[in-house]
Each structure stands twice: as C-alpha cells, then as structure tokens.
Amino acid sequence: MNEILNKQDDKALWEYENFVKTHINGNFMQSLCWTGVKRTWEWEAIVSRDDTGKIKGTALILIKKIPFLGCSFLYSPHGPVCDYTDVKTLRDIFEGIEKLKELHNGYELRVDPCITENDTKEINIMKSLGFEFQENAPELTTIQARNNYILRINNRSKEEIFESFHKKWRYNIRLSLRKGVECRVCGPECLDDFYKLMEETGKRDGFCIRSKEYFELMLKNLGEHCRLYMCYHDNEPLSGAITTQYAGKTCYVYGASTAKSRNVMPNYLMQWNMICWAVENGCSIYDFQGIPFYKDENHPNYGVYRFKQGFNGEVLTYA
C-alpha cells in the first residue's frame, strides 16, 4: 500500500530517510535533505509498505509549477528507490505518484532510476508500467548524465586502489604532493574561492554555472553528506570540488579549476583525496559522474573522459 509522506510526522520523516540512505539504490537526490537545495521546486514523497508496514520503496518527487498554464512537471531524480525487479512495489509507488499528478495537475512525470542500459529485465518492467525508454537520447538532453565513470571500491585498501591507477596518474599525484599542493576539506568560508574557480571554468569551457547560493545550500542542507574540497598552492586556490557521500556512494558532483599552475597537478591530488574519503567510510562506489561525448575522440569534452579514465574505473551507462 502507498501513502503520501506526512511532512509533519517526524517519525515518518526519519523512517523515510533511514530507508533511502541505507538502500543499495539510494541516492542523495532522493534524500529529504535535497529538498532544501531545490528550493524553487515544491516536493512530495511516496512511501510503499508491505502488509506488515515495512517500507519496500520510496520516491521523492520534485514539482515545478508551469506559470500561466496551471499545470506541473513532476520529476523523481534517480528515483524511485526500491528493488527494480519488484513489480508489485514499483506499481504501488507509481500508483501513489498518479495521485500526486492529479493533486498538482501534472502533465508529465520523468524518472531516471539507477538502472543501467544492460539491465533488460528492469527496463522491460519499467516499460510494462507505462514508461518510455529513451534509448537513443542525444548527449546532454537528459536531466541527469546517462554516461558516468565509476570506480568500484570492492573493499580494497587505499594502497590497492592507488596501485591500480595508470602509472602516469600515480606519478602526478606524488608530484603534486612534492610541489607542496595542499588539499583541504573546507567549510563555507572557502566558497568565494571555489566560486571564482567555477566562474573561470564555466567561461573557459563554455557552460552555464549554478549560483553561489546553490552551492551554499548544498553544503548547508546535505551537512555531513557533503564536502567542499579545495587545492591550494602557496595559498592560491587552484581547484575545488563539491562531493557528496550517501547510501554507500561518493559522488564528485561539481568541479572547478584554474588554467594557472596546472604543472603542479592539483586535480589529480584532489581526486585522490576524495577517493580516500570513499574508502575510509566503506563506500562501494566512487562516482566521477558524467562523461558526455566520451566515444568521440575529437570532441572538446573527450579530455574529461581521458582524465577520469586514468583512475582505472569503468563506464556506466544508465537507461
């Protein structure tokens, strides 16, 4: 049976959050903390329980009102959270979401669950429930990146993981340390430094960036699940990243760097420090996130893939 989460019930909120953060398919964007970041959206959540009252699945739904049209767009980022082979639970969750669509006059529901393109059983189940699989969607047309680069930790030690990197990547990490680059875990006091790097990166690489307030909200609302990493050389900021750790996964969500002093290799050291955070807390995956156009060696973004590839992970393509 499904229910709309009661936002006034502290026990229900705790129970929801505990389910999501301990589930293998949990994701920080399905956390209630994420609603404090997406402040321009309304939100609801659906909870599906078995006959004993145990939670079997959940879905956080972001709701965007469309001005002047009186309708809404509903989106569940990397949701729902459940066993994707459990048809009964999936159907129950989506029946609950249909109630939300009626309440908010929804014209479209979009979900991007953590199902890979090779999970044909799960894909067919989603199709049977009325969803369309955008198999050939062009790069950058989906809300979340379809092609990610991940490093599976697999209970390995830091030493074992380090030795698995390409030898040039190991050299660059050691070089960065020898050159005196310092990678720090920072608080909001370093956001100005990070945002200047982000502005430079966006201008250099030709993409729009989030507001500084957005990054402030991430650090504030995700709390212990979010870190700001900064690399400094002689107290000059060279690179920075906002990284999350939730449900057994550490995700490199936003990164920025200056074109100056690249010879001291700050980005290599920063990634290594974030991977160490994942290992220290028993994560199963370190997610480098998107690698758009990674199959096209002539595309300007190909260098993003080449950099991440040196850490000896694998490409994961979501459905």
Question: What is each stretch, according to the model?
Answer:
Residues 2-52, 56-70, 113-118, 126-263:
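A conserved beta-strand-loop-helix scaffold within acyl/acetyltransferase catalytic domains
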Residues 80-134:
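A gly/proline- and charged-residue-enriched helix-loop-helix capping module
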Residues 74-76, 109, 286:
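Hydrophobic faces of well-ordered beta-strands that scaffold small-molecule active sites
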Residues 77-87, 154-156, 255-264, 292:
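A short, internal acetyl-CoA/4′-phosphopantetheine-binding micro-motif in the GNAT/acyltransferase core
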Residues 91-102, 216-319:
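Aromatic (often tryptophan-rich) hydrophobic motifs at membrane interfaces
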Residues 17, 98, 123, 173, ...:
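Short glycine-/small-residue-rich flexible loop motifs, especially phosphate/cofactor-binding loops
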